[in-house]
Amino acid sequence: MATSAGKLRTLYSAHSSLSSLPPSARPTLQLATLRSYATTTPHDSPIGNTSNTPPTVKRPATAFKDKLNAGPAFSDFVSGKKDEPLDPAEAYALKTALVGPPGRKKEITRLPPWLKTPIPDSSNYKRIKNDLRGLNLHTVCEEARCPNIADCWGGSSKSAATATIMLMGDTCTRGCRFCSVKTSNKPPPLDPHEPDNTAEALSRWGLGYVVLTTVDRDDLADGGARHCAETVMKIKQKAPNILVECLTGDYAGDLDMVALVANSGLDVFAHNVETVEALTPFVRDRRASFQQSLRVLKAAKAAKPELITKTSLMLGLGETEAQLWDALRALRAINVDVVTFGQYMRPTKRHMAVHEYVRPDVFDLWKERALEMGFLYCASGPLVRSSYKAGEAFIENVLKKRKGGNAGSVNEKVTTSENVKKLVAGEAMR
């Protein structure tokens, strides 16, 4: 120990430059001197000559701070100076991004600002989600990754909370190129308790409007029509004041099953044509067709003329203006009451790509055109979905006005225990 101390004193006295420094600086320089003598490269100064040494690699945190310091200052963002407009190439660059691993990066188009929504966070949202898990129920809101889940489940001052329950499981027998719902030729069997569980959940939530949607079940003889109708009846028994909309499949073209669901006590019968006729073979499953969807909507109206019928079209798939006009004329010809327009948004990279992001003013234009053609109601906007804001005050008022004082008797007629038993036994109601 004494020998080491003596060596340090000798080393210190050998450099007169160190003795002239203030005491506080000496330990640092002394340590630097020791490090320089520990290397194999000779140095001409106590601190060492760095001309022959490799550059020092900065720690990630230090490099990040240096990058921030070299970036724009706060004044660059609050300056009152008006910037020059971007040229088309620069504007496009702001809407694209490179994603993927090094060497395999792909350029993708970023979402425009009008398609961005807040993160869901409300007591009503959390309560509905917990009940769904407890009763083993599914919603198309979650399965289809709907961007409006916070708005619909949370409700607002202008409309009641709306939930879309997905019946008959979470697996569809069809594989449409726009849809993110799971697909299989042999999905799990139906849950016999689902109608009761759905009615129980809805009676707890106190919703003003509920949408029941179904996966396609081509593996079932009736396509699941009786299961759907039984669920509607059970809901009306437990919560007679709730308004029920059914967003159904085409039941493989079986119009008797369409009539069965239409007469089950629901308030709105919805079936989506999804896109214009020319694009249907490229967008929907091969077992679906535009003309078959028209027949389904027409049969529902024929089975119950006072029933509101509804359909939806996605924009941004490559449709033309003339094709949209033709689709609307075909829908009005069969007395469809409500139509909605929404932007197609690609769920995953495995699904068909977006052809274009349609501007909000174009959606407003198609809403005006639809209303001028005689549709009872039209919801149109980038974030509108077939069941989005289905419980809007306008539709609720129309339904209540149509029912008037006979609402109770109509519901009682189709929701008696006797009719439920007949339905389960396979007897269609007439």
UniProtKB/Swiss-Prot annotation:
Name its pathway. Protein modification; protein lipoylation via endogenous pathway; protein N(6)-(lipoyl)lysine from octanoyl-[acyl-carrier-protein]: step 2/2
Q: Where is the composition biased (Polar residues)?
A: 39-55
Cofactor(s) required, per the database record: [4Fe-4S] cluster
GO terms for cellular component: mitochondrion
Q: Which Pfam families match?
A: LIAS_N, Radical_SAM
Main location group = mitochondrion
Q: Which UniProt keywords apply?
A: 4Fe-4S, Iron, Iron-sulfur, Metal-binding, Mitochondrion, S-adenosyl-L-methionine, Transferase, Transit peptide
Q: What is this protein called?
A: Lipoyl synthase, mitochondrial
Q: Give residue ranges for domain Radical SAM core.
A: 155-376
Q: Which family does it belong to?
A: Belongs to the radical SAM superfamily. Lipoyl synthase family.
Which residues form the organelle targeting sequence per the record? Answer: 1-37
Question: Which residues hold [4Fe-4S] cluster 2?
Answer: 172, 176, 179
Q: Return the InterPro entries for the record.
A: Aldolase_TIM, Elp3/MiaA/NifB-like_rSAM, LIAS_N, Lipoyl_synth, rSAM
Explain how, and how many, cofactor molecules are bound.
Answer: Binds 2 [4Fe-4S] clusters per subunit. One cluster is coordinated with 3 cysteines and an exchangeable S-adenosyl-L-methionine.
The family database entries (PROSITE patterns) matched by this protein are listed as:
RADICAL_SAM
Q: Where is this region: Disordered?
A: 39-59
Q: Which reaction is catalysed here?
A: [[Fe-S] cluster scaffold protein carrying a second [4Fe-4S](2+) cluster] + N(6)-octanoyl-L-lysyl-[protein] + 2 oxidized [2Fe-2S]-[ferredoxin] + 2 S-adenosyl-L-methionine + 4 H(+) = [[Fe-S] cluster scaffold protein] + N(6)-[(R)-dihydrolipoyl]-L-lysyl-[protein] + 4 Fe(3+) + 2 hydrogen sulfide + 2 5'-deoxyadenosine + 2 L-methionine + 2 reduced [2Fe-2S]-[ferredoxin]
EC number of this enzyme: 2.8.1.8
Its localization reads: Mitochondrion
The residues that hold [4Fe-4S] cluster 1 are 141, 146, 152, 387
Read off the PANTHER family from this record.
LIPOYL SYNTHASE, LIPOYL SYNTHASE, MITOCHONDRIAL
What Gene3D superfamilies would the database entry show? Aldolase class I
A GO term, aspect molecular function: 4 iron, 4 sulfur cluster binding
